[in-house]
Each structure stands twice: as C-alpha cells, then as structure tokens.
Amino acid sequence: DFRCPTTWSASKLYCYKPFKEKKTWIEAERFCAKQAENGHLVSIGSAAEADFLDLVIVVNFDKQRYRAWTGLTERNLKWTNGASVSYENLYEPYIRKCFVVQPWEGKSKWYKADCEEKNAFLCKFPKPH
C-alpha cells in the first residue's frame, strides 16, 4: 500500500503538498512536475476534494491571506494533468489567464490571476496502484 512522502497530505487516491515559496504559474507547474511522477499543480475534481484541500490549506497557510496557484488555466479550461473541468468554484470579476485559490467567507474560491504573478502553490500527484 503506497504511502505519501512524510511532508505530503494523503487522500485515498492522491498526495498533496502546499508550497509557500512564491513562483510564477509556469515555474510552479515545472516545480510540481519534478516532485513526483505525474506531479502537477493541483486539480480539483469535486466539492469533496475542495473541502479536503481547505483542510490542507488551513494547516499550512495563513487562512485569511493565502493565494495559491492551481493547475487551471483559462486558455482551455483543462487541468495541467489533462483532465477536463468537471467541478467549478469560480469567482467571476477577474479576467486574466491562470487560477489561484484564495479565501472567501472561510472557504477557498477560484480567482483568475495574471500567470506572471508570483504566488504560493499546491502540488498533487496520483498514488501509484
């Protein structure tokens, strides 16, 4: 039975880790890819996964003031792991290209951000079977 590395948080199928170091979106995606096989910026496939990530975020970031890259870009609305968007949690007014999660009323919401901005980020990789 595969165990996530000690500093990573485990769900049934995936390992997750937030990084406070600030990077542009593409720098963060490249960094996540180096962390593990099939590593990417986080994709969020369901409300349950979003709730799990909120717990990971609260433990690792200042829950009032975080801003962290996800693997979603506006260009094709696909996650960096190739998955189509099956669940959305968007906050509308911002029109840019890449997406961050940041707090809104105690939960993480998705906001558009300039891909060149430097932000913290969340990595994810699937547990090998």
UniProtKB/Swiss-Prot annotation:
Positions of disulphide bridges: C4-C15, C32-C123, C98-C115
Keywords: Disulfide bond, Hemostasis impairing toxin, Platelet aggregation inhibiting toxin, Secreted, Toxin
Keyword Transferase attributed: no
A cellular component term, taken from the record's GO annotations: extracellular region
Domain C-type lectin per the UniProt entry, residue ranges: 3-125
Pfam family, one: Lectin_C
Subunit structure comment from the entry: Heterotetramer of subunit alpha, beta, gamma and delta; only the gamma and the delta subunits are disulfide-linked. Alpha-beta heterodimer and gamma-delta heterodimer associate orthogonally, giving a cruciform conformation. This heterotetramer may covalently dimerizes thanks to the gamma subunit.
GO molecular function list: toxin activity
Broad class of the protein's primary localization: secreted
Location relative to the cell: Secreted
Family annotation (Gene3D superfamilies): Mannose-Binding Protein A, subunit A
InterPro entries xref list: C-type_lectin-like, C-type_lectin-like/link_sf, C-type_lectin/snaclec_domain, CTDL_fold
Name this polypeptide is given: Snaclec rhodocetin subunit beta
PROSITE patterns linked to this entry: C_TYPE_LECTIN_2
Organism: Calloselasma rhodostoma (Malayan pit viper)
Tissue: Expressed by the venom gland.
Region forming the signal peptide: none
Biological role: Potent inhibitor of collagen-induced platelet aggregation. It acts by binding to the integrin alpha2A domain and blocks collagen binding to integrin alpha-2/beta-1 (ITGA2/ITGB1). The gamma/delta subunits mainly contribute to this activity.
Membership in a protein family: Belongs to the snaclec family.
